[in-house]
Amino acid sequence: MKIAITITVVMLSICCSSASSDICPGFLQVLEALLMESESGYVASLKPFNPGSDLQNAGTQLKRLVDTLPQETRINIMKLTEKILTSPLCKQDLRF
């Protein structure tokens, strides 16, 4: 469960940072692929961004960790992400 929390916090901090008032749709597609698709589907979602081999390998390792989470947990992480991204609080500059 710690990995789920870590992944969620990292993704949400990127999505809700004051530097990114508009979220790249491609990023959200990659996030969804990370949580919901097969490893090959996730790797395919990265291709348009031309990650180097080191970055792609790191992403693949992350995907393998995410895949150890129960399906219900991954679905709930997607729901949590959507809830936060659509919240009025996400448009504010929150400091933790």
UniProtKB/Swiss-Prot annotation:
SUPFAM superfamilies to which the protein is assigned, alphabetical: Uteroglobin-like
Name of the protein described by the UniProt record: Uteroglobin
A Gene Ontology cellular-component term: cytoplasm
Organism this protein belongs to: Mus musculus
The entry's keywords: Disulfide bond, Phospholipase A2 inhibitor, Secreted, Signal
Domain of life: Eukaryota
PROSITE patterns documented for this protein: SCGB
Tissue specificity note: Club cells (nonciliated cells of the surface epithelium of the pulmonary airways).
Signal peptide (UniProt feature, chain positions): 1-21
Assigned protein family: Belongs to the secretoglobin family.
Assembly, per entry: Antiparallel homodimer; disulfide-linked. Interaction with LMBR1L is controversial.
Localization, UniProt: Secreted
Inducing factors: By glucocorticoids.
Biological process (GO), any one: negative regulation of transcription by RNA polymerase II
Pfam families: Uteroglobin (PF01099)
InterPro entries on file: Secretoglobin (IPR016126), Secretoglobin_1C-like (IPR043215), Secretoglobin_sf (IPR035960), Uteroglobin (IPR000329)
Biological function: Binds phosphatidylcholine, phosphatidylinositol, polychlorinated biphenyls (PCB) and weakly progesterone, potent inhibitor of phospholipase A2.
Listed PANTHER family: SECRETOGLOBIN FAMILY 1 MEMBER (PTHR10136), UTEROGLOBIN (PTHR10136:SF6)
GO molecular function: phospholipase A2 inhibitor activity; polychlorinated biphenyl binding
